[in-house]
């Protein structure tokens, strides 16, 4: 270990299975790029650890070998490469890549093969990620740089806290962020020995989950702290059904769980600079928003009408996103002095049914199947009100985009939607926090009630402008999220002797 000397900067090793733009299957890839950048902007020394998939190795401009690992018989030989993740011309993040051709050098996806099946050796593939994450976060690290915090993400790095727990030497404090509890990394019990975990780890008070080894349960059980992507989701996962069998353990650890809302990229999502808008605007010149409404109506083939509210949604068309409720509500909305613009793709039957509604109400309902980046920006800017009827939503992004664009949303009161959208009430209007509308029952009638509340508010021009400005003035930046994580890191360091003070 390096010799100790005073140091203020917190060192964070961010262990992740994916990071944009090198490799991405979902929102975790975006978070893995954005959060470390925001942490570094707060003067923290955040670095990434990532498996060396072909796309990752191909995307590295330069690399150098900094360590070798002989972890046989549990894992094939591996080397550690040092590089940088280039975010833009002026911003990059230090990156460690695990080069292990036997586990990562193959065609197909990150988690799935070419037929859409899980790779049969995923336990070993992400066991190695977890193991090297733990080694780098302890006094067994071959590197001079040793973190104070190892920040794990979802099941793929869930064994890192377990390996650290059974390491007798100095080690970093561990945090695991739960982005999606539905994916748990459950494997047959014989993987315990294969992965080099002690027998005692495989118990109810450990990584055992209904007879299987659960990477995610291991992370939840052994980590020093747990975070989720919103305070609401942090509460919901401690009970059925969103605990997915882990609600009992999560409830026992409730004092160690913190919900922190993800940020949005305000460089990309900014109505003052957005290149996809026909007219840019800020909270001070909201009248310019009307030009985008007209452009959206023309683009989608809707009647040009500024007098009635135009509702919009950009979504995967799935049961989880409440698209079936949207299907029920759309014709009811068409009977009102209102319009709907929808962009999305997903369930084939829902796609067909929504497209049929657009044909039945051509001046009132417009549907585009697929995804269109430019149109998604124009919908956020050109609609008057955004709709998000998700059954559950750990965090959600579109409701933050829409508020940032002065488009108050109607949302189901769940997870991150409940945390980021403040329901309009006399009290929230008075304290200038109101920014949208909640509905509480997952039914068409309850959703429609929220829409009607929005329509009534829309026709009160002064009230509506207040709602718009309240939403636009909220801080949805990654800096706010990074500051919250900084507070957790500091508390964990007080409880835990840092692995390095050099």
UniProtKB/Swiss-Prot annotation:
Pathway: Glycan biosynthesis; glycogen biosynthesis
InterPro entries: Glyco_trans_1, GS/SS, Starch_synth_cat_dom
SUPFAM superfamilies: UDP-Glycosyltransferase/glycogen phosphorylase
Stored Pfam families: Glyco_transf_5, Glycos_transf_1
Residues engaged in binding ADP-alpha-D-glucose: 24
EC number: 2.4.1.21
GO biological process: glycogen biosynthetic process
HAMAP family: Glycogen_synth
Family: Belongs to the glycosyltransferase 1 family. Bacterial/plant glycogen synthase subfamily.
Main function: Synthesizes alpha-1,4-glucan chains using ADP-glucose.
Annotated protein name in UniProt: Glycogen synthase
GN (gene name): glgA
